[in-house]
Amino acid sequence: MTNLRKTHPLMKIVNHSFIDLPAPSNISAWWNFGSLLGICLVIQILTGLFLAMHYTSDTLTAFSSVAHICRDVNYGWLIRNLHANGASMFFMCLFLHVGRGIYYGSYLYKETWNIGVILLLTVMATAFVGYVLPWGQMSFWGATVITNLLSAIPYVGTTLAEWIWGGFAVDKATLTRFFAFHFILPFIITALVIVHLLFLHETGSNNPSGINPDSDKIPFHPYYTIKDALGLMFLLLTLLLLALFSPDSLGDPDNFSPANPLNTPPHIKPEWYFLFAYAILRSIPNKLGGVLALLASILILLVIPFLHTANQRSMMFRPISQTLFWILSANLITLTWIGGQPVEQPFIIIGQLASILYFLLILVLMPLAGLFENYMLKPKW
């Protein structure tokens, strides 16, 4: 009798995706982040669903309803802490996943990569509207500052901003629609994840060497299910340590005060995972220029496949490109630090230099390094 998982129409899909899937035998722990992101998404949807059962999206009661969840709902404090810190874990895994893609040349699977960039943008949009929901000071002013950037668009900007707000400023209508967006977007993300996997399974996974792995494949189960389970243990351990021992360390103290349109916080800043883009936005003194730089900082990922000049796919055997990659990583950490600092010297100039270096590395230096490495590998006799 044939195994049910190989004959049943639904089980067959699961089997081909997670059990009998041929996977390269040499993929490292850097390939764990895809499954970890899937787990993060499930955690966020489940905790978010329970939070939505007790939350009210009204300017008068939103802040109180979050306090009520933490004080009166059974394990409400835990659900909220898991949801808030789960977002940080989600972005940590996302950044590492994208970094892995750049380092090992996974971006050459263009369809998978492009869907991935769309996923990144959608997750960022979801996190932004979600941060507004507790209706604390930083929620309100963060929403005001970021939505106000739309007004920099020539001719239609102000109309567009007011259309998003549902009035002449961030208010009740804005909060209600942001809650609606925050509820629906994770399901759109889930659909995009399925498309992402669909494209990935058309080509199969890349591997650290960047060489075609077809001659040496192993079944996904049990080898990589066990490996992913280990990654999951580390993820859950980190998330629980964060949520149980230091739940507010990544948040902003201003968000413990209810939103007050008459009192501006001294330093308006987003959550840590947006700080690198916020630093790039602030490094340009012109409003429209800043908005364009902000968009470019993420959308630049779409042009990376077209800037691949090296004869080798992976950076595994390309020391110059490796050096530039780690400079880029350090540069992003610098931008994250600058994004959280006040707008004064020396932070302004450091932010501007780091922003220039960010674009210079991706658009100029890394493609040149690829060409130089090709030249170095050519026989000279």
From Swiss-Prot:
Broad class of where this protein is predominantly found: mitochondrion
User: Would you tell me the Gene Ontology cellular component terms?
Assistant: mitochondrial inner membrane; respiratory chain complex III
Where, in this chain's numbering, is heme b b562 bound?
Answer: H83, H182
What keywords tag this UniProt record? Electron transport, Heme, Iron, Membrane, Metal-binding, Mitochondrion, Mitochondrion inner membrane, Respiratory chain, Transmembrane, Transmembrane helix, Transport, Ubiquinone
Q: What is this protein called?
A: Cytochrome b
Task: Name the domain of life this protein comes from.
Answer: Eukaryota
Obligatory cofactor(s) = heme b
Pfam short name (any one) = Cytochrome_B
Question: Function, please?
Answer: Component of the ubiquinol-cytochrome c reductase complex (complex III or cytochrome b-c1 complex) that is part of the mitochondrial respiratory chain. The b-c1 complex mediates electron transfer from ubiquinol to cytochrome c. Contributes to the generation of a proton gradient across the mitochondrial membrane that is then used for ATP synthesis.
This chain's source organism reads Planigale tenuirostris
Molecular function as annotated in GO:
metal ion binding; ubiquinol-cytochrome-c reductase activity
